[in-house]
Amino acid sequence: MSERKAINKYYPPDYNPLEAEKLSRKMAKKLKTMNKSHASIRLMTPFSMRCLECNEYIPKSRKFNGKKELLKEKYLDSIKIYRLTISCPRCANSIAFRTDPGNSDYVMEVGGVRNYVPQKPNDDLNAKTAVESIDETLQRLVREKEMEQNEKMGIKEQADDKMDLLEKRLAKIQQEQEDDEELENLRKKNLEMSQRAEMINRSKHAQQEKAVTTDDLDNLVDQVFDNHRQRTNKPGNNNDEKRTPLFNPTSTKGKIQKKSSVRTNPLGIVIKRGKSLK
């Protein structure tokens, strides 16, 4: 019987362990990259879809174990296009969709229907089918090349006139600074003018208020005197004329006399001073 674990192994005379390691690594790389076009991956659905067999709703961003397949077609002969296939979680129907690098989107192929298809208002039939025609690609490439050439020419001209550009920028900055200073001066002047106008208006209002108060006082005094005159000059009010003053200096003028020294008695006998009755 042979040994289960062989201890003695045959090594040929031309055996080199370094070369054997290199060969094993190369074979491992070949085995890994042998079926690179077909690979099983873990993916998430990029949009919501519906299965055509069982009408199962598959939401967006749901995880699946699917397969990735590299197609022979290429967008603009440089960008690769991949086909992704998943199975329906209810009926195991295969659903396939592929990448669309022209519109930065995905296109449904087999087994399902996309629930919502975003469409632009000015899209053509080719754009709706997410396939760009050869003429359109050529026109777009020509436009892109023209734009690149124009940009390069503009950059060259700018490189030739760098000093002029710097001078223009400096002049522009200086002009902006001068404009800012002028604006600040105008703002200060406007503030001063507005403050002066406010002071003048306040003084005018104060003078007007003073004049109004003096006029009101004069009017009140005149009104009081007028009312008093009207009361005194009424026709039925003659009491002042009938009244006589208590003291009339004109009536007693020249009539004041001294008291006589002669005394009288009720019997009619005159009695003089210094004499007595016998």
Curated annotation (Swiss-Prot):
InterPro entries: Saf4/Yju2, Yju2. The keyword Membrane does not apply. GO terms for biological process: generation of catalytic spliceosome for first transesterification step; generation of catalytic spliceosome for second transesterification step; mRNA splicing, via spliceosome; RNA splicing. Zn(2+) binds at residues 51, 54, 88, 91. The keyword Glycosyltransferase does not apply. It holds the Pfam family Saf4_Yju2. GO terms for cellular component: nucleus; Prp19 complex; U2-type catalytic step 1 spliceosome; U2-type catalytic step 2 spliceosome. GO terms for molecular function: metal ion binding; U2 snRNA binding. It is found in: Nucleus. Keywords: Metal-binding, mRNA processing, mRNA splicing, Nucleus, Spliceosome, Zinc. Its main location: nucleus. Residues 228-278 are annotated as: Disordered. Induction: Expressed in exponential-phase cells grown in rich medium. HAMAP family: YJU2. Component of the spliceosome. Present in the activated B complex, the catalytically activated B* complex which catalyzes the branching, the catalytic step 1 C complex catalyzing the exon ligation, and the postcatalytic P complex containing the ligated exons (mRNA) and the excised lariat intron. Interacts (via C-terminus) with CLF1. Interacts (via N-terminus) with SYF1. Interacts with U2 snRNA; this interaction is direct. This is Splicing factor YJU2. It comes from Saccharomyces cerevisiae (strain ATCC 204508 / S288c) (Baker's yeast). The lineage of its organism: Eukaryota, Fungi, Dikarya, Ascomycota, Saccharomycotina.
